[in-house]
Amino acid sequence: GEGEESAEPEKVYKDTPSTDTFVTSYYTFPDNFTTNLKGSKAFLQISVGVSTQYDETVIENVESHQLALRSEVLGAVSEFSVEQIEGKTGRDDLANKIKEAMNERLEELEGFGGVEGVYFTSFVLQ
């Protein structure tokens, strides 16, 4: 009879949005960054990675403008003193400053920043 068909709940398939939201892409700069800290003979050596949830274009831009972005990272680090980067809060502040500097430069070069996270894969203060 007609009532039998409705025993099975109807499956509704939702279209996946064309933008891959929440897919995070990462890029790690191949070489360390080493620079003096402000007002000190101490220097900081870091390895830096970045992340974005935008499309691959952001990572491609980071890669193709690596030289300009390295300069931005070194400039940002050299504005910090030893006291300012000690502890997790200091590292977070430094990461945010680097992110801002990278995005400003990418906006100049490509019209769009898109770097959402900056990570230190190594962090050595000497």
Q: What residue ranges belong to the model's regions?
A:
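Flexible, low-complexity charged segments
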Residues: 1-126
